[in-house]
């Protein structure tokens, strides 16, 4: 499709673009992500120009009505050889309404335009991500509550360390998920509107930036025009929080892969989220978890690429920042899909409680409790008791004797060799699974304490859900306010069409 007027070329730069440069510079495909936000952005700017007395009512109405048409048509009707979505929308608008479209960019640069549209879309995607994380968090809490008292070995350095429960293990990840669900909605600067900053020093047109911010659902205008257009602090902060969440969920995927190994066999993912071998008919492989682990690793790595692109750029705006937008949407898309898959895996997990108990039985995982008993009863410092129990553990391990209640008498014999005398009954008690799970501190694996923790985490997820609702309510009120503003121009239907994009039911 030929590029409709007006193109940004034909003034200081004449002629067409070199085809290789055109391919390099085009961001149209990634800009589909912000298409509807950019139209809303433009509608509000047209209203602002009218309210500032810079264009008349008829011109403003024609522009806004044309923008509603562009929104209804969808991104597939945009010129394919435009440099970006901003040029494409303006060009298509010119085809729809004629020369009046040329007034739209008065007092606005692509710099504040793209910064605003990206924040608007990122806000929408953050709300969706938070909702998905809340769903995953609740699935983890349901799993944790169901198996709150089922013992399993906790590992450090991939060696059996101390007993905990399946509930404690899964709730550890639920706690991280709850933090991320809130954190993605609390990125500094996300609720500040760059519109009106122009290229970087501020617009020469006296638009009401507070009014623009309110109509677009922001809490306030960005406080510094240069920072809002030249830097990408909120995007990098968001990528950082996404990377942290991704790295934590990578570990969840890895743990589940390990727990479903033949050697442990504690969990098994559902068939619909597993694969088989092309040659070995007996295999059931956790492919979904392996792919999630890899994809989330990419998400974590994209933050570093974003820093590399952004870092060392001179003030103020540089075209390099276009690449950063692509990294952002790539991260968001990968992350959202992985969270959905993880939730389905967690909801469909089959847990073998006996296999979980088997990871603790026959081990020396209660050695810490024994060392504390030795320190208390024998009058040794903990460091001295630590060494005593360490030597006992080494000898028993060489002989293949577990540090278990059933072999408490053997443990007592070895302690006596170290000059420590304890009763078999008290050693048997401290080595029992029930006893080793009792931890009298807040947030511990103790089943009673864990129940309190699970309730608290469920409340945190509910708080994240309320925060999401608050944000969605603000956007909806802004959409209604924008609709009221364009109604004053005699134009109707903008909000209804926009909601279709927000609900994922838009054309294109």
From Swiss-Prot:
Enzyme Commission identifier(s): 4.3.2.1
One Pfam family linked to the record: ASL_C2
Alphabetical UniProt keywords: Amino-acid biosynthesis, Arginine biosynthesis, Cytoplasm, Lyase
Stated family: Belongs to the lyase 1 family. Argininosuccinate lyase subfamily.
Pathway named in the protein's UniProt entry: Amino-acid biosynthesis; L-arginine biosynthesis; L-arginine from L-ornithine and carbamoyl phosphate: step 3/3
Protein's name in the database: Argininosuccinate lyase
Localization (cell): Cytoplasm
Single Gene Ontology MF annotation: argininosuccinate lyase activity
Catalytic activity: 2-(N(omega)-L-arginino)succinate = fumarate + L-arginine
InterPro entries according to UniProt: Arg_succ_lyase_C, Argininosuccinate_lyase, Fumarase/histidase_N, Fumarate_lyase_fam, Fumarate_lyase_N, L-Aspartase-like
An annotated GO BP: arginine biosynthetic process via ornithine
GO CC annotation: cytosol
